């Protein structure tokens, strides 16, 4: 999910099942609204959709959270997996990869920023940048961003 959404750690870990629009593969995180960083909408690819559905099928609880792990446990699991695999990949590295990959696929910076929750504050940018969820979905779908294929090649 990190690599295909551009979400921050706490945005991802705070997601609730109701934040996911499966029909559009869209996430509307509601947990972050700072002065410079705001959650807007995020999208996930078919790879993430398949993995997420597989994960949710194993859950037999009524917990509304999408991921049942605390930030502290998540960090521990992430460090363990990184150590065991020998790959020094962090959540921030995946977020940066997402930004770089979207740029490589031709997405203008203002939309990459929007995907990553960096919505412009200026009146000019707000007025002349179409940041509607429908427009962002259209742009995201055109990229056909693939994570596993890219990681296998590099």
Residue ranges and their predicted role:
Residues 135-154:
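C-terminal secondary-structure termini that scaffold catalytic or DNA-interacting sites
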Residues 17, 83, 104, 117:
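Residue-level detection of the helix-turn-helix DNA-binding "recognition helix"
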Residues 19, 101, 119, 131-135:
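The DNA-recognition helices of helix-turn-helix-type DNA-binding domains
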């Amino acid at each position: 999910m990190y690599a295909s959404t551009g979400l921050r750690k706490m945005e991802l870990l705070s997601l609730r099942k109701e934040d996911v629009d499966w029909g559009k593969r869209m996430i509307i995180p509601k947990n972050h609204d700072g002065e410079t960083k705001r959650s807007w909408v995020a999208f996930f690819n078919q790879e993430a959709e398949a993995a997420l559905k597989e994960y949710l099928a194993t859950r037999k609880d009524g917990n509304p959270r999408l991921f049942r792990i605390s930030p502290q446990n998540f960090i521990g699991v992430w460090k363990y997996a990184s150590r065991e695999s020998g790959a020094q990949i962090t959540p921030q590295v995946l977020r940066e990869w997402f930004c770089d990959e979207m740029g490589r696929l031709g997405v203008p910076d203002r939309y990459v920023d929007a995907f990553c929750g960096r919505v412009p504050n200026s009146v000019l940018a707000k007025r002349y940048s179409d940041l509607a969820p429908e427009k962002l979905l259209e742009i995201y779908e055109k990229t056909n961003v693939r994570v596993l294929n890219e990681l296998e090649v590099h």
